[in-house]
């Protein structure tokens, strides 16, 4: 019987759960990943629950930047100790697509103890995808930090960046509503 390391076992799970129709659709629509198994997010969340926190495996998966599912699973396995602003910024600098950016913010960045610093660093980036992540992050806090959300959204709307335009407009609208209510 063959023994597999953790990374190989996870990849075998991806393969067993693959969805060729979804994978082909993603490829045709410009997904930047060379390898796409076509798993949906609930399937990836189930795998993460089975594995539990595992920083070493999370780093291996994140380094596997040619595989979509590896990039989606990695943030789910990270322990709180790994969620430093410096480490998360290093990871953010390697993100190139919205799906991974959304998942990264939801599964890792929001759990960081240094959200304010990350908001400042991501929001001040020259890379549109990092500013997109900052908007996603501030949007999750718009009720409690509407002034900052409004400032960030207005600044991003001034840039007129296609990637962030609609999200910035949503953040602005919600921040204005909360500002009126308070």
Regions found by a protein language model. Name each.
Residues 1-182:
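Alpha-helical scaffold domains
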């Amino acid at each position: 019987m063959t023994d597999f390391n953790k990374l190989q076992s996870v990849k075998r799970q991806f393969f067993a759960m693959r969805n060729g129709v979804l994978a082909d659709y993603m490829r045709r629509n410009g997904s930047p990943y060379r390898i796409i198994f076509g798993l949906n997010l609930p399937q990836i969340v189930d795998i993460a629950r089975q594995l539990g926190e595992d920083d070493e495996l999370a780093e291996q998966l994140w380094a596997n930047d040619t595989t979509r599912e590896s990039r989606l699973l990695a943030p789910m396995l990270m322990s709180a100790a790994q969620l430093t602003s410096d480490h998360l910024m290093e990871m953010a600098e390697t993100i190139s697509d919205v799906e991974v950016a959304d998942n990264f913010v939801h599964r890792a960045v929001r759990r960081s103890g240094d959200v304010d610093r990350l908001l400042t660093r991501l929001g001040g980036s020259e890379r549109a995808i990092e500013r997109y992540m900052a908007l996603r992050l501030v949007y999750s806090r718009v009720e409690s930090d509407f002034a900052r959300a409004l400032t960030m959204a207005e600044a991003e709307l001034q840039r007129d960046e296609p990637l962030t335009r609609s999200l910035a407009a949503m953040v602005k609208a919600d921040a204005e509503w909360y500002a009126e209510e308070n």
